[in-house]
């Protein structure tokens, strides 16, 4: 039932319209839509909204879905091989001088060792560290590349890795109205 609701919500026509997106409302609904799935996987997701009342982004809701669904699915994949017992995804959305700053952090396995010296390579097309049991690369390597491409189409927007002690962190910034 949750997948049906998730699917129907994802294909709403209004998500493909250029509109003013209430970011507080968007992220509240986004997190709520993921909670049942994450609960079954024993992953806690936490949302912090800081100074976000009345904050709008002019854009396509489908763009935000593409970006943040990718972040969640990457975290789920990271937790598959993590020994972490208290699996947590933290989403912090704040209004900072006319910009929406969205920090997305999990306490999973973090970046693969191969990216420690050149972490921004993960934004390249076809770049993946996901391998099968014979060490063949099987991930598409397109998720973060697509996210970066979407973000680059918004004025004064950016995506960057966040340095975190444990796990993985990524920040997106959008100019808001």
Task: Show which residues each predicted segment covers.
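Conserved catalytic submotifs in the C-terminal HATPase_c
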Residues: 44-55
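Glycine-rich ATP-binding loops of the HATPase_c
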Residues: 155-163
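Conserved DHp (HisKA) dimerization/phosphotransfer helix of two-component histidine kinases, i.e.
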Residues: 1-43
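Conserved ATP-binding N-box helix of the HATPase_c
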Residues: 63-82
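Short beta-strand/loop element within the Bergerat-fold HATPase_c
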Residues: 86-98
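Acidic ATP/Mg2+-coordinating residue in the GHKL
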Residues: 106
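Conserved glycine-/histidine-rich ATP-lid loop and adjacent helix of the Bergerat-fold HATPase_c
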Residues: 146-156
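Short conserved segment of the HATPase_c
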Residues: 111-126
């Amino acid at each position: 039932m949750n997948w049906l609701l998730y699917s129907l919500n994802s294909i709403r026509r209004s998500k493909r319209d250029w509109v003013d997106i209430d970011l507080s409302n968007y992220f509240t609904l986004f997190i709520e839509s993921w909670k049942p799935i994450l609960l079954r996987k024993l992953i806690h997701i936490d949302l912090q909204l800081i100074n976000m009342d009345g904050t709008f982004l002019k854009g396509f809701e489908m763009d935000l879905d593409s970006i943040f669904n990718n972040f969640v699915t990457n975290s789920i994949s990271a937790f598959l091989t993590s020994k972490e017992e208290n699996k947590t995804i933290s989403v912090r959305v704040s209004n900072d001088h006319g910009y929406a700053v969205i920090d997305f952090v999990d306490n999973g396995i973090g970046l693969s060792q191969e990216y420690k010296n050149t972490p921004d390579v993960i934004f390249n097309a076809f770049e993946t560290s996901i391998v099968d049991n014979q060490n063949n690369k099987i991930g598409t390597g397109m998720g973060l590349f697509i996210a970066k491409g979407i973000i680059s189409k918004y004025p004064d927007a950016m995506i960057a890795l966040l340095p975190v002690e444990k796990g993985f962190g990524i920040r997106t910034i959008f100019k808001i109205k």
